[in-house]
Amino acid sequence: MNHTHKTNWRSLSFAAIICCCSTIAACHREVTREPASLPNISVIDDHGRPVSLSSLKGKVVLLDFIHIGCPGVCATLVSKFGEVADSLKPELGSRVVLLSVTNDPEHDRPEQLLALARSSDADLDGWLFVTGKPDDVDRVIKAFGVNNERMPDGSPAHITQVFLLGTDGQKKREYRGMLMKPQAVVSQIRDAMTQVQGGAS
């Protein structure tokens, strides 16, 4: 009887070890998965021109998602982006790009985005307001783990996350947009630029 119990315990212990090893391997796969990054697609800017997102590599990018007809949350995000842009004037466009992507591409046309940009006094040399094919825009949104959800009336839900991307196009930081402190973001953008200057990967 005792011999049988010992055999059973050994079997259970071996099974537990196998289970633990499998769990550790699964956790390792989760940790090493590919980081969020801009997909290699083209979008349309506020002048109706195609822009390849891959062309932004080599620059630090601050990314958000907005849409026309969103006076509350989106207006706040635009205002905060404006503060960031004003603090980065020397580097804006050459080393840093602000990228505002509409999450309502079915309705937001380039001319509407241009009107929004102008009414916000946006520096269009380094701040892109873009739309595109719905499938392409969805790819950008989902690349950062966000769902482009709809409200009961069919209008797009607010996306409040803001993303800081390194020069390789990969996500370095994520912010809650409504709580984002522009000057803190500016400091982190400058840190990202300094890392590039210093040859850091």
Map each language-model feature to its residues.
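Short, small/polar residue-rich loop motifs at catalytic or cofactor-binding pockets
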Residues: 37, 60, 157-159
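Sec-dependent bacterial lipoprotein signal peptides
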Residues: 1-25
